[in-house]
Amino acid sequence: MAGNSRRRGAVRKAGTKKGPTVGSGGQRRRGLEGRGPTPPAHLRPNHPAAKRAQSPPRRPAKRTEETETVLGRNPVLECLRAGVPATALYVALGTEADERLTESVSRAADSGISILEVPRADLDRMTGNHLHQGIALQVPPYIYAHPDDLLEAAAGSPPALLVALDNISDPRNLGAIVRSVAAFGGHGVLIPQRRSASVTAVAWRTSAGAAARIPVARATNLTRTLQDWADRGLRVIGLDAGGDTTLDDLDGSDPLVVVVGSEGKGLSRLVRQNCDEVVSIPMAGSAESLNASVAAGVVLAEISRQRRG
């Protein structure tokens, strides 16, 4: 259009007109004749996909436990009274002392735990701005035993008495069961590596110090470990309200593994299938079930009674 001829770039300069697109004249196509179909990307040496395929596989990240920090005057004091292993006690500068803080500092000093005074802002950062009341206790990760260590702990003594926990999720139940195992002559506790409560400061505190004496082991595959123990001569006894026998008929004289199911679902299907016997606890009245740690304590007490008799 004549009206647009003044627009910059509207009129092509002489000698700048593009010519027809020029191809290879079929040379590239003829050069590929007889070579077959194009190989997949991962088989072409210079293709990024081939380089990725030839590189060594990435190793999965190693799962490590994290240091735990206990916050607050009552929780910290309870941990120190229970002998929970700790590496450092942090106290915020300017914190008003009371009997709990004074006793915590005294117990930490007697136990050889480092006592560090830090600015309150630093303690806020360390604790993620959670309520700490001016005091925090650093607890290192628990060192778990190997399942074979539990068998070694039971060797050369009365018949083995071990407890396996099938996905117990409450650390207080774990701690209470560890305490019952210690009280009734058990040799160790086995937990799954995944989907299970860990030996945290809460579990340690609930065990009333028994976690220092009773080894807790982790199994990568709980069912497989129970099968291995059964092959080594241990009877696997599951606890369930719908058991095929009652506690009154249980013979506790053999080497035993007592398996306690999770708080809500009880024994998982595979674990139940690998039990030699499933035992229920007879109860009076309308009570339908017991807490997992209470049920474990009842059974362990009965086994201990039989072995004493």
From Swiss-Prot:
What Pfam family does this protein match (any one)? SpoU_sub_bind
Coiled coil stretches, renumbered: none
Cross-referenced Gene3D superfamilies, in alphabetical order? 3.30.1330.30, 3.40.1280.10
Q: Where is the composition biased (Basic residues)?
A: 1-16
Per the UniProt entry, the Enzyme Commission number(s) are 2.1.1.-
Q: Which residues bind S-adenosyl-L-methionine?
A: G261, I281, L290
Q: Which InterPro entries match?
A: Alpha/beta_knot_MTases (IPR029028), Ribosomal_eL30-like_sf (IPR029064), rRNA_MeTrfase_TrmH (IPR004441), SpoU_MeTrfase (IPR001537), SpoU_subst-bd (IPR013123), tRNA_m1G_MTases_N (IPR029026)
For the keyword Iron-sulfur, the answer is no
**What GO biological process terms does the UniProt entry carry, in alphabetical order?**
methylation; RNA processing
A single GO CC term for this protein reads:
cytosol
UniProt keywords (A-Z) are:
Methyltransferase, S-adenosyl-L-methionine, Transferase
Select a single GO molecular function from the record's annotations and give it: RNA binding
Region of interest (Disordered), ranges: 1-70
Similarity-based family = Belongs to the class IV-like SAM-binding methyltransferase superfamily. RNA methyltransferase TrmH family.
The protein, known as: Uncharacterized tRNA/rRNA methyltransferase MAV_0574
